[in-house]
Amino acid sequence: MIRAFSFPVSPERGRLRGWLEGSLAGLCELHWLRERQEYRVQQALRLAQPGMGGAEAEDEEDADEDEDAAAARRAAAALEEQLEALPGLVWDLGQQLGDLSLESGGLEQESGRSSGFYEDPSSTGGPDSPPSTFCGDSGFSGSSSYGRLGPSEPRGIYASERPKSLGDASPSAPEVVGARAAVPRSFSAPYPTAGGSAGPEACSSAERRARAGPFLTPSPLHAVAMRSPRPCGRPPTDSPDAGGAGRPLDGYISALLRRRRRRGAGQPRTSPGGADGGPRRQNSVRQRPPDASPSPGSARPAREPSLERVGGHPTSPAALSRAWASSWESEAAPEPAAPPAAPSPPDSPAEGRLVKAQYIPGAQAATRGLPGRAARRKPPPLTRGRSVEQSPPRERPRAAGRRGRMAEASGRRGSPRARKASRSQSETSLLGRASAVPSGPPKYPTAEREEPRPPRPRRGPAPTLAAQAAGSCRRWRSTAEIDAADGRRVRPRAPAARVPGPGPSPSAPQRRLLYGCAGSDSECSAGRLGPLGRRGPAGGVGGGYGESESSASEGESPAFSSASSDSDGSGGLVWPQQLVAATAASGGGAGAGAPAGPAKVFVKIKASHALKKKILRFRSGSLKVMTTV
């Protein structure tokens, strides 16, 4: 029957197993209560009888009473000793329970049929026969087993799966006395019940009656589990080698304990020693494999003399229980001391590696993260052909540090040298692609700009900031207004913009434009006054009008941020647009013959921040997509 429970069980089977064990514990409890009641009835009958034959009966009664009194005294002393050691033992029990209850089904496989429910739980022999009185130990006091049946039933389940001792087996069974001394089981084990009594059944009932305290009574499940064939095959306690027989059992169970508690030492820990690592470090020797093995070894010398003394019966129960408590305290002592020290030095090499790998580099990465990220991502915009639009959100914070022209994007005026360097840098990356632009007529009536102009977006914030600073109303200005304003404003300065550099080298005129014509909308000036003047030199370049126009408008774009918004008043974007009538002339590339005034239409947009960013990001496609009027 029990083999069904020995492999790892599903939750439902675990619950069923708990119920079965609880009901078995209740049966054992009832059995013991019945025995105790029978004993009381016999005592009452014996008192009622006047005498069973004179001196014989009196002597017999005196002997019984002496034995009962001695047993009661021994039990009281043991209980007192145990009560003193209770807090530490209960704490240690909680730690071990928390540790060992993690794996539910493994112990039965290791220790053989250790939960011997099937052996003799239902036997109904006399009170002193070993099969029946293994249930009759004081371990089955009401509070204990009923508590197991009740709220703390899971604890009972786990307790039955711990490495178990014979501490709950009956004092009446001859073989169990040495076993109780031998096995460091639960912390109710220090019941040295029949340790001092010569007869196996001498103190069974009186002692049980004396020891039926409310706590420290082991669970009946331990007694049931300890009826396994391994412990039961040992010789009786009276035999001279009882102590020697206790030792192998002790070694076996403590080895079981060590093996179970240390099992997780090499396994990877999912957490680098955080909140949930704490209790596990406290309660298990598993985290301290070096300590685990010597601790039971060092405790065993203290335990073995007491075993031998128990075998020869001279040990007093108080001393025995004291030895028990001390040995278990010594075994449990390293555990409370260890938790503070556990995090700092990793105990096992595997664990140290794990903690270092997960925890310490995490901290270093946290400290290094921001500078590392900044250093890693700064270079790409500085490489020549690289598009700056890969990281638009970062424009403003790093603008001034990255390129010279970003100083204007932040609203500050850079030096002409910086502007020159930035312009030539971006232009050189685009010069190779300029000739690849088809010179056919543009698809839409807009000024044609080369498609691959990604480095322009860095100027996106410039008109944005200028437009926001200008704060004028958002509206479309008619072509007439723009013509009038720009004609009035730009005529005197337009030639100065044309003079400095010839068209075929686009970088030169645009460099001059940035600071030579800073106060004006050089786009407007180019469109209104000097289409002829600009296109004359630029005619040799394929798509001359489109290229020079686009490079002029883009080269001038930083000037928007600083000066054009001031002179312009509305701070919008000014886009030159070819009317359909002039499309053929401008698209054909014969810039010199293009009509000057009415063919060029400007639409000045007071656009939102997002719209301007989009327009400036896609310089060529933006007009076609968004602002065709």
From Swiss-Prot:
Biased amino acid composition, Acidic residues: 56-69
Source species: Homo sapiens
A GO term from the CC aspect: cytoplasm
InterPro entries to which the protein is assigned, alphabetical: Dapper
Family to which this protein belongs: Belongs to the dapper family.
Domain notes: The C-terminal PDZ-binding motif may mediate interaction with the PDZ domains of DSH (Dishevelled) family proteins.
Gene: DACT3
Protein name, entry field: Dapper homolog 3
Keywords: Coiled coil, Methylation, Phosphoprotein, Wnt signaling pathway
Region (Disordered): 50-76, 105-574
BP GO annotations: canonical Wnt signaling pathway; epithelial to mesenchymal transition; negative regulation of canonical Wnt signaling pathway; negative regulation of cell growth; negative regulation of epithelial to mesenchymal transition; negative regulation of Wnt signaling pathway
Segments carrying motif PDZ-binding: 626-629
Modified residues (Omega-N-methylarginine): R258
Ranges annotated as biased composition (Basic and acidic residues): 301-311
Biased composition regions of type Pro residues, renumbered to the chain: 336-348
Summary of the function given for this chain in its UniProt record: May be involved in regulation of intracellular signaling pathways during development. Specifically thought to play a role in canonical and/or non-canonical Wnt signaling pathways through interaction with DSH (Dishevelled) family proteins.
